[in-house]
Structure formats: C-alpha cells, structure tokens
C-alpha cells in the first residue's frame, strides 16, 4: 500500500504543524529514579537498601540517565518547506508510473538552481530490461563468458600472456635450439654458469628433470639458498629446447609477493644473458605491471592472484604447459585456494605438469594432498650457524634489567593478545606445569644471576633493553658483520631505534642503522642491500619481511625477537584481532638461515628452551584466520561449485562458523541470493579485484558521478595509504596529515587531498613532486601504484557499462567530485554497516568524545587517524573501514557522516514513536528525531532510490544528468540536494550549555 504524501501537506502548500504533543521541553518524569522513602531525596538511594543493592540501584539510575541523555542528543532530520513540497510532488509523480499515459512534466529548481524533474519509465521498458537481465544471468551460469562486457580490454591487459596460443612450431623449435647453443659461447652466460654450478640444485639437474617429465605432480623441497626458485624453471625450459620441442614449453611460476616475482625474473633473465621481458625467454606479470617474455618457449614469474584472475577467462589454463607453485609452505590464502583449483584441473588437463616448491619441514603434507606424488629434496647452501637461547644470551652478556617491575611469567599466559584457541591453552598449561622442573634443570648449568633474570622476565613483551645490550656486546666483542634484528612491529622498531640512538656510540658514522617496515620510506630501505665500507657496521631492524621476501647477503648476526604480528578473525565477535604471538619453528628456522649466507653466523633467540620446545611447527594458515567474503565471491565467479563444499576440500578447511558468517555478510550486501548464487551486484563485485565493501563503493562512485576521488579512496583501502613515518618525525608527520585533512573530519578525504596535491606537483615537474612528498611524508611509489590501480578500476567500470570512458577523470563521471558531502555519502554506501556513534563528553577540563559501536560498546579511534583528537564534530556518526582488536578495539580509516547519508545508504528504515519523540531509525539503532511526515518522505525517497539502484546494477549505464525529465535524474538529484544542504545537526532540546557541541 502506497503512502499518500499529500496527507501531510496543508492546502496552502505549507507543512502542517506537527504539534507539541507531550509538550514542553522535557520536565516530565521527575521521580523516574524511584526515589521515595526517607533518604531518597535529591537522588539518594532508598533507606531500606543495603550493600550490593545500593550499587545496583545507582547503576540502574545511571543507565536510565544515560538513555534519557541519548534521547535528548538525537539529531533532528528536517528539510525546508520548499524541498518538502518538491519531494511530495516527485514521489506522487513516481507513484503514478503504472498509468502509461501519465508523463509528468514537473520541473523545478532547488535553492542552488539545481533543477530536477521526473519522467515515468514505461512498464514495457522495465519488462524488457528484466528480460535482458534474465538472459544475461543464464549466460553467466551456463557459459564461460564475461557478464555484460562491452569492452574486453580491461580483462585482457593482465591476461595477455595467458590468451596467447601455444601450438607446436617446428621453425621456432630450431631457432630456440640455435639460440641456446649460441648462448654457451657468450661470456656473460659463461660467467653466470660458474655461479649456477655452485648451487646445490645444479648438481641435481638431471634427476629433477626426469622426475618432472615422468610425473604429473612433483614436490620439491629445499632450504633457502639451494636455488630451486631460479634454477628449476630453467632446467625444464632448457630440457624442452634441447629435445627440439621448445615451442611447447610455457612455464608459469607463482610467487607470494610482487617484489619476489620481479626480482626472481630479473635474476633468471640475467643468468640467461638476456634482459627481462621484451620478448626474451623470461619475464614477469604482477598486478598492473608486466615485462612479458616471448609467446612460446618461455618462463613467466607472476603473483598468485594473477593465475586466479586468468582462471576467469580460461578455466583450464589451456596455454600453460607447466605451473610451478613456489613458497607454498607460507600457506597464504590465495596459494591454498589455487592448490585446490589445480588439483581439480588435473582431471581435465592430463598434459599439465605441476611442480610444488616448499621449505623442508612440511613437504610430506603437500605430497599427501596430491595423492602421495613423488618428492625430492635439495640440500641447502648455508654456512653453519651457532644458536643461542634466552638463558645463553643472559649468561653470555651478563644481562640484568635496570627496571624491576617485570610481571610474573604466568600473568597473561603463553600467548599475548586475545587469541584463545584450544591448542594454545593446552600449551600454556603444559608450559606452567613444566616450568619449575625446567628452572631446576637450568640451575645445574647456569649462574644464579641468570636464573633470577629468567624468573623475572615478562613473557608478554619483547625486551628491547636486552636487545640493545646484546647489539652493544656484539659490536664490542664479536667480529665484523651486519646485524639483523627481527621485531614484531613498527612500535618495537621505533623504540629500539631510539634506544640505540640515545647512546653516544651508535651516533657515530661507524654504524648504519636501517629500520625496515612497510611504513618506512622506501628510499631509506634501498641502503639495506648495499655493502657498507670497511669499518662501518650495518644494523637492520626489521619485521618478518626479512625472513623470506628480501635477502641481505652480508648478515652474520641475527637477533630473533621471538614474536610475530599475526592477524586473526574472531568469528564469534565478528572482529579482526592483531597481536604479537610467538614465532613458529618454521619462522625461527628461516631467521636462523639469514645468518649463514656468506660465512659462519650466529643466531640469538629471545625465548628460553622450554618455550622453544612448545612452539608451533608453522604459523596458522591464513585461510583459518581471515574473513572469507572476497574468497567466496571468487569461488562463485570461477564456478567452483558450492562455497562450503569447495572450502571443505582445501588442505586446511576453515571453520563452518567462518564460512556461514561470510555467506551471511554477502547476502546482507545483496551480493548472493538465498540460493548462494551471485546476484547482478555480486557479479560486479566478484569481477572487481577488491573486497566487496570497497567494490560497492566503487560502483556507487560511478553511479553518483564522483568517480575520481572515490577510486583514490578505494585504491588506498585495498592497497595501503601513501603516508610514511620516518623515525623521530612522527609528530611532524601527524601534523602534516592533519593539515591535509582540511577540516573534512575524514581519513578517506585526507588521502584524496594528498593524492590531488601529488598530481598537481607531478604536473609541475619532478622536483616539485619530490618536494611535495618530502613535505607531507608521502611515498611517491605508493601514490603511483594508487594511480595505476585507479586506471584498472575505471577499465572494469567501462567494461561493465557503468561509465563511458576509461579515464578516472572523465568530466561526465565527476560531476559531483567537488562535493565533500556526496563523497562521504558514497563512502557510507560502501562501508555500511561499519558505523560508530560519537558522544560528546563535556568534562570539567576539556571536551572529549567517546565512540561506541553496536556490537562492541566503547571503542577507540586509531591514533594515526585525523579524527583521534577531534572534538568539534558536525554529526555524531562515523563510518569506518576496519575494526581491529590489539591492546584495545581500534577503528581505522573513519569519516564523519550526516543523518541523510545513513538514511539513504544505510540499512532498513523504520518510523516509530519514543515517548514524546517522533523518530526515524536505521536498522533499529541509528535513531534520529523526525516529524512523521518528513520521515515518510525520506522513506519513500529511499524506496525509489533502492529500485533505481537495482535497475542500474542489473542493466548498467551512466546517468544522464542533463535529462532533467527522467525519473533517474529526478530521484538522484533530490537525494543529492538533501545531502549537500544538510546543516550541522543540533538537537532541539539540548540544555543550553551543550549547544556548542555538534550532534547527529
């Protein structure tokens, strides 16, 4: 039943008075606290209450007081008379759409002279669009074709190598053989051969090739430095060329990280006396960047995600002869999924050769997963490394902590943080049980002083004072060689750096101290690979990035802090957690291996022998500790079957709870229907290479014509923001970031402002770009990556029909890009329901804000946010990208949003009455005051928006903003006009002293 929007409008065209109802400014329930009886005057508790009852009485009274304060703080949703009348006419006109002959000729202008009118679409047109959509859905489910692709170039760019044919070519076979023979006389090739022959893998060349040729799947295990990544692919290619069938060989080797794919490809090309790519034998392909090799007789190194993307275009990888999955022991989510896909693919591609390459410790597990396929081990190439445990270090350097307020061993238990998995709790119990016997055993071999220090050590923290003392000892007592320190995160790296620099000795030019972290400027990090001059000692302080991603050749001393930052996903509370946890045995082994690459080395582990015996063999696979929404969409777009069924066949299947929660979230997002099939929106989100909420934001940025800034935000959220934090300049960097915020109260718009400033500086020349990045602590490499990603997103939108140009800056797609409020509305559309409420706390000393979420209660804005110290908010709602529990629950990347943003782009709307207040609520908890007639207008407009958006998603085409008679233009213009003109929302009935605070 439709609502009559005329019923609330008086005959003279103005709004009817809503009446004061239960009148006048509050008063009301004076005695609501229950007062009465003797002592109950002036808010005191009743005299008959005793002990705990008194506390409960006051708690109940405070709860009632808080609820009433919250009621009074509700913002008022209102609109002026002119807009109200216009929207009444618009909605009544749209309701008449079933009358085929009615075509409203209404046209009017908002106060900003922004006219919007309506033209009723015919039923015939709607039916034809639905019919077209049904045909397309049928295509999606039955054929391997792209959904509504009008321009295939955006798919083909990263798939160029895959889409090339691989047919036998006798002429090419002969040419490849001649080229290889010619290489053997090339001085560069000969020099490289000398190096290659020293690698352990080189002596096993014949054995490796025979095993691969005679089996469909082979597992190769080998220690760091054995040469498996660079040599195995070359052995295969050269064998094919020498057998005269080189054109049939197309090897693709996956790498878990971009930096690895590039560096390995360049190394292999150099070993073959060639340049990387350019039609030679070796190249690489990573997202938005490639140097492709020749079409046939070639090796391509690529990131795992590239293969998953290829599978959308060719589910059988028809043109690939060999697929090498490298570093699979790392167990990242994409490699685990790809293994299962490849396992299924083997049934259809009996000619496909699969080579799995892993570190030594768990090769058997991969062999078992692939039907007990053959394994071969390549020995490592490292010098002996002496290992020291915590008790050895304390004894060796005679360490005694200056501060004695260390906590007990068992105050927080085996694991730091909030990860309470059963196996961890069991290990904690074992640790506590064995500790007395372990200490007793140590007393026979170590001094009493060492035992005392061990007893007082705080297991929760990495002892940075101990590390500083150990570095000093190595520098003064041991021989030359670089020192590599492994720490969990940025805060530890920063503190240790400060500790060292506070000592006069380390300030001299005899030391080069290099922090290595993703937040650090990359220009500083290039020094890490350079050999230092004689007399200068390099000290590298790094996270686990230095375990496998990069190799620092001159390291002799490794200090293993014993902890690693690990993200988990708590399915019960629907929250990500990050904590510093103990390393696994595999981590410890990798760290030890960093010390013996060029000469005998030393590795110092900052945990005791009992702890070492209880370490996990490996880190928990990523798929068991991460949200699965993006993966679920990939499973559906690749047509891999039912989500739960496919995930159950992984090497380590995620929990049923995690799968159910992800499917539920995707249904709430309207990406999956009740049968777990992709909706039209789901198809678009699955094709975008970002997580679903960011994908939805991208689509809305196109629909609401604020494309360029929204793509900047989406790229930053899915990659990383461009800010860097040089050590010692943290406060200046924070100040510069707040300067870029420009009073937007938005981390997202801060990135937009930073990016636009960079674009302007870049247009003026390299020197201006460099100065701009230096002044505002920005990474030009990251900004360039964001620029490239924006181009990729725009091509996806063009291919799907949402925009008419591949340029993010196309004027037609950016009509509203200068309007901050509309951009915030689109951010809200993408990130909802990630909403938090702000409450202004007017304390005696200074104003403060408290932030709450529906499920967690009190939370904190992350210290790096531009909103962390903000008190003058215009509204009291934030939308955020990420909620993570570390030492407390933090909100990352948040933006203040207005009531209309939440009403039009949030959840379900309901209209209710709360005592004397008429209210409109979003999902029952985001509540605003609103006269009933206004609430019905908003709800009616929201309903029309939902219908329009559904049509746009099912049959994408750009909005024609010049067609002021169309329904699309009329509805969108009315909504955008309300959002743009939303005033600061101050509740009508707040006490006068609070009127300087803004609410909504």
Curated annotation (Swiss-Prot):
A motif (DEAH box) lies at residues 326-329. Residues 209-379 form the Helicase ATP-binding domain. Gene3D superfamilies: 1.20.120.1080, P-loop containing nucleotide triphosphate hydrolases (3.40.50.300). Residues 621-690 are annotated as: WH domain. It is found in: Nucleus; Cytoplasm; Cytoplasm, Cytosol; Cytoplasm, Stress granule. Residues 45-97 are annotated as: Required for G4-DNA- and G4-RNA-binding. ATPase activity is enhanced in the presence of homomeric poly(U) RNAs, but not by double-stranded DNA (dsDNA), double-stranded RNA (dsRNA) and tRNA. The modification N6-acetyllysine is found at residue 939. The modification Phosphoserine is found at residue 153. Residues 1-43 are annotated as: Required for recruitment to cytoplasmic stress granules. It catalyses: ATP + H2O = ADP + phosphate + H(+). It is an enzyme of class 3 (hydrolase). Residues 257-309, 490-549, 630-689, 841-852, 862-892 are annotated as: Necessary for interaction with single-stranded DNA at the 3'-end of the G4-DNA structure. Pfam families: DEAD, HA2_C, HA2_N, Helicase_C, OB_NTP_bind. GO terms for biological process: 3'-UTR-mediated mRNA destabilization; cell differentiation; cellular response to arsenite ion; cellular response to heat; cellular response to UV; defense response to virus; innate immune response; negative regulation of translation. It comes from the Eukaryota. Residues 15-40 have a biased composition (Gly residues). A motif (Nuclear localization signal) lies at residues 509-520. Residues 45-67 are annotated as: DSM (DHX36-specific motif). GO terms for cellular component: axon; chromosome, telomeric region; cytoplasm; cytoplasmic stress granule; cytosol; dendrite; mitochondrion; nuclear speck. Residues 1-192 are annotated as: Necessary for nuclear and nucleolar caps localizations. Its EC number is 3.6.4.12, 3.6.4.13. Multifunctional ATP-dependent helicase that unwinds G-quadruplex (G4) structures. Plays a role in many biological processes such as genomic integrity, gene expression regulations and as a sensor to initiate antiviral responses. G4 structures correspond to helical structures containing guanine tetrads. Binds with high affinity to and unwinds G4 structures that are formed in nucleic acids (G4-DNA and G4-RNA). Plays a role in genomic integrity. The DHX36-specific motif (DSM) form folds into a DNA-binding-induced alpha-helix that together with the oligonucleotide and oligosaccharide-binding-fold-like (OB-fold-like) subdomain bind to Myc-promoter G4-DNA-containing structure in an ATP-dependent manner. Upon G4-DNA-binding, DHX36 pulls on DSM in the 3'-direction, inducing rearrangement of the RecA-like 1 and 2 and the degenerate-winged-helix (WH) regions; these rearrangements are probably responsible for the ATP-independent repetitive G4-DNA unfolding activity, one residue at a time. Found in a multi-helicase-TICAM1 complex at least composed of DHX36, DDX1, DDX21 and TICAM1; this complex exists in resting cells with or without dsRNA poly(I:C) ligand stimulation. Interacts (via C-terminus) with TICAM1 (via TIR domain). Interacts (via C-terminus) with DDX21; this interaction serves as bridges to TICAM1. Interacts with TERT; this interaction is dependent on the ability of DHX36 to bind to the G-quadruplex RNA (G4-RNA) structure present in the telomerase RNA template component (TERC). This is ATP-dependent DNA/RNA helicase DHX36. The gene is Dhx36.
């Amino acid at each position: 039943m439709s609502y009559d929007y005329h019923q609330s409008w008086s005959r003279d065209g103005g709004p009817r008075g809503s009446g004061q109802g239960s009148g006048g400014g509050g008063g009301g329930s004076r005695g609501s606290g229950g007062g009465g009886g003797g002592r109950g005057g002036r808010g005191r508790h009743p005299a008959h209450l005793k002990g705990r009852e008194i506390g409960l009485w006051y708690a109940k009274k405070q709860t009632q007081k808080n609820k009433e304060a919250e009621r009074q703080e509700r913002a008022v949703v209102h609109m002026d008379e002119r807009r109200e009348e216009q929207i009444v006419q618009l909605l009544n006109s749209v309701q008449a759409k079933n009358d085929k002959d009615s075509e409203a000729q209404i046209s009017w202008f908002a106060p900003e002279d922004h006219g919007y009118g309506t033209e009723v679409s015919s039923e015939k047109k709607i039916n034809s669009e639905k019919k077209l959509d049904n045909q397309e859905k049928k295509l999606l489910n039955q054929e391997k074709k792209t959904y509504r692709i009008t321009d295939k170039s955006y798919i083909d760019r990263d798939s160029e190598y895959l889409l090339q044919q691989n047919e036998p070519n006798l002429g090419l076979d002969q040419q490849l053989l001649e080229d290889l023979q010619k290489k053997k006389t090339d001085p560069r090739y000969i020099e490289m051969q000398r190096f290659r022959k020293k690698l352990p893998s080189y002596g096993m060349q014949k054995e490796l090739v025979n095993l691969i040729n005679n089996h469909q799947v082979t597992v190769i295990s080998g220690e760091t430095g054995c040469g498996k990544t660079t040599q195995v692919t070359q052995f295969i290619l050269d064998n094919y060329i020498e057998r005269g069938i080189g054109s049939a060989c197309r090897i693709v080797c996956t790498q878990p990280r971009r930096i690895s794919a590039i560096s390995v490809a360049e190394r292999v090309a150099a070993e073959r006396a060639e340049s990387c790519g350019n039609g030679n034998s070796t190249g690489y392909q990573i997202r938005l960047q490639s140097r492709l090799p020749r079409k046939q007789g070639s090796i391509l190194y690529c990131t795992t995600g590239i293969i998953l993307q290829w599978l959308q275009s060719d589910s059988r990888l028809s043109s690939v002869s060999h697929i090498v999955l490298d570093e699979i022991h790392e167990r990242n989510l994409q490699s685990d999924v790809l293994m299962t896909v490849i396992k299924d693919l083997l049934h259809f591609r009996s000619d496909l050769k699969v080579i799995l390459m892993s570190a030594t410790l768990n090769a058997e597990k991969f062999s078992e997963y692939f039907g007990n396929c053959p394994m071969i081990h390549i020995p490592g190439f490292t010098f002996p490394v002496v290992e020291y445990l915590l008790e050895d270090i304390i004894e060796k350097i005679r360490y005694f902590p200056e501060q004695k307020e260390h906590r007990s061993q068992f105050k927080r238990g085996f694991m730091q943080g909030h990860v309470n998995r059963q196996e961890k709790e069991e290990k904690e119990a074992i640790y506590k049980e064995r500790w007395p016997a372990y200490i007793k055993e140590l007393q026979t071999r170590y001094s009493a002083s060492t035992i005392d220090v061990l007893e007082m050590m705080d297991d929760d923290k990495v002892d940075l004072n101990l590390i500083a003392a150990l570095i000093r000892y190595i520098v003064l007592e041991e021989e030359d060689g670089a020192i590599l320190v492994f720490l969990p995160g940025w805060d530890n790296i920063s503190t240790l750096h400060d500790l060292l620099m506070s000592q006069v000795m380390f300030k001299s030019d005899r030391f080069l101290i290099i922090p290595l972290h993703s937040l650090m400027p990359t220009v500083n990090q290039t020094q890490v690979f350079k050999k230092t001059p004689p007399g200068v000692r390099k000290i590298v302080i790094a996270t686990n990035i230095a375990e496998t991603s990069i190799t620092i050749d001159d390291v002799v001393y490794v200090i293993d802090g014993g902890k690693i930052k690990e993200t988990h996903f708590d399915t019960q509370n629907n929250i990500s957690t990050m904590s510093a946890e103990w390393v696994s045995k595999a981590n410890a082994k990798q760290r030890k291996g960093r010390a013996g690459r060029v000469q005998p080395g030393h590795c110092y582990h900052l945990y005791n022998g009992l702890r070492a015996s209880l370490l996990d063999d490996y880190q928990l696979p990523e798929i068991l500790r991460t949200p699965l929404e993006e993966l679920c969409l990939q499973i559906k777009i690749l047509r891999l079957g039912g989500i739960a069924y496919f995930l159950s066949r992984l090497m380590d299947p995620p929990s049923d709870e995690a799968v159910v929660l992800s499917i539920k979230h995707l249904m709430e997002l309207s990406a999956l229907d009740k049968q777990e099939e992709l909706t039209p929106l789901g198809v678009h989100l699955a094709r975008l290479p970002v997580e679903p909420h960011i994908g939805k934001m991208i689509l809305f940025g196109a629909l609401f014509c604020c494309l360029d800034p929204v793509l900047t935000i989406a790229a930053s959220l899915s990659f990383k923001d461009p800010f860097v934090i040089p050590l010692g300049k943290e406060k200046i960097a924070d100040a510069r970031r707040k300067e870029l915020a420009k009073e937007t109260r938005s981390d997202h718009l801060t990135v937009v402002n930073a990016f636009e400033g960079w674009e302007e500086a870049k247009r003026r020349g390299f020197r201006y770009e460099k100065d701009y990045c230096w002044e505002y602590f920005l990474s030009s490499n990251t900004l360039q990556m964001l620029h490239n990603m924006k181009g990729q997103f725009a091509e996806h939108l063009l291919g799907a029909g949402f925009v008419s140009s591949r340029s993010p800056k196309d004027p037609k797609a950016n009509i509203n890009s200068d309007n901050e409020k509309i951009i915030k509305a689109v951010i809200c559309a993408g990130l909802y329901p990630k909403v938090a409420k702000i409450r202004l706390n007017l304390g005696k000393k200074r104003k403060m804000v408290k932030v709450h979420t529906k499920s967690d209660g009190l939370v904190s804005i992350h210290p790096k946010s531009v909103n962390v110290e903000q008190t003058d908010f215009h509204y009291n709602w934030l939308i955020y990208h990420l909620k993570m529990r570390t030492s407390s629950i933090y909100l990352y990347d948040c933006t203040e949003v207005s009531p209309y943003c939440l009403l039009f782009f949030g959840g379900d709307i309901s209209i209710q009455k709360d005592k004397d207040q008429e209210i409109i609520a979003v999902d029952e908890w985001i509540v605003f005051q609103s006269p009933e007639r206004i609430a019905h207008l908003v709800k009616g407009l929201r309903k029309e928006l939902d219908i329009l958006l559904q049509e746009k998603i099912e049959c994408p085409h750009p909005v024609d903003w010049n067609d002021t008679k169309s329904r699309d233009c009329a509805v969108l213009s009315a909504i955008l006009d309300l959002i743009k003109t939303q005033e600061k929302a101050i509740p009508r009935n707040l006490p006068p002293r609070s009127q300087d605070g803004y609410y909504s």
